A protein has these predicted regions:
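Glutamate identity and glutamate-enriched acidic tracts
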Residues: 10-11, 19-22, 48, 61, ...
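Exposed, low-complexity/repetitive linear segments and helix-based recognition motifs
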Residues: 17-19, 45, 55, 59, ...
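Mixed-charge, low-complexity intrinsically disordered regions
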Residues: 10-11, 98-104
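Intrinsically disordered, low-complexity regions
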Residues: 1-2, 13, 18, 54, ...
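Short glycine-aromatic motifs
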Residues: 13, 21, 27, 44, ...
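Intrinsically disordered, low-complexity, charged/polar segments
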Residues: 63-100
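Basic/aromatic-rich interaction segments and small domains that mediate binding to polyanionic partners
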Residues: 2, 26-74
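Mixed-charge, Lys/Arg-rich low-complexity intrinsically disordered regions
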Residues: 1-32
């Protein structure tokens, strides 16, 4: 599965075109709705796993969030991601989800 996101210059300050990226999975956001960022029940495409964080696409932009607490810095907004589809052979998203499930 592919998605199109903006391509930025080296400094990351200006959009210089578009780029096609591979979608490696999908997560559902469960929690408080913030109209500018998250909607309860919405499914987001994941394009990268970086440590304990995932890069998700929201409409056309991509954002990096901590998997276990994506709303950590937002006052009054609480939520989490649940893996809906993991397209990776290594099941990277499922392993990340299980890592936090086992720690609670």
């Amino acid at each position: 599965m592919k998605a199109i996101i903006p391509k930025y210059n080296e400094e990351g300050s200006k959009i210089i075109g578009k780029q096609e990226v591979e979608v490696i999975g999908q997560v559902k956001y469960i929690g408080d709705t913030d109209p500018l960022s998250f909607v309860d029940g919405k499914i987001y495409n994941v394009i990268e796993v970086i440590g304990n964080s995932i890069r998700v696409i929201d409409v056309i932009e991509d954002y990096l969030y901590m998997f276990d607490d994506p709303t950590i810095n937002w006052k009054g907004i609480n939520g989490k991601f649940i893996v809906v589809n993991d397209f990776t052979e290594e099941k990277l998203l499922e392993k990340l989800q299980n890592k936090f499930k086992n720690n609670k």
